[in-house]
């Protein structure tokens, strides 16, 4: 197991996992996410190849539609 910081919270994950593995484990919709890994935005095309290591910091932001056009 390794320790990462996910959205500001410590999290233990299995060693050798990628960003895509993490997204899958969290059951998040990949098409609506932005991922920052150690202060760098990672393109979705690289999620499978970007391995997570002990001490990494990951921020995952999920885009949600909605709002009111009348208040613009």
Predicted regions and their residues:
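Bateman/CBS regulatory modules and CBS-like beta-alpha motifs in cytosolic regions of diverse proteins
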Residues: 10-12
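Eukaryote-biased recognition of intrinsically disordered, low-complexity regulatory segments
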Residues: 1-7
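Loop/turn positions that initiate beta-strands
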Residues: 55-58
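Short, Lys/Arg- and Gly-enriched loop/turn segments at beta-strand edges
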Residues: 65-72
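Compact, glycine-rich, soluble single-domain proteins
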Residues: 5, 14-47
């Amino acid at each position: 197991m390794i320790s990462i910081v996910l959205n500001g919270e410590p999290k233990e994950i299995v060693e050798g996992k990628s960003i895509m593995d993490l997204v899958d484990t969290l059951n998040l919709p990949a098409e609506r996410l932005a991922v920052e890994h150690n202060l760098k935005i990672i393109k979705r095309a690289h999620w499978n190849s970007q391995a997570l290591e002990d001490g990494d910091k990951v921020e995952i932001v999920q885009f949600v539609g909605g709002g009111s056009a009348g208040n613009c």
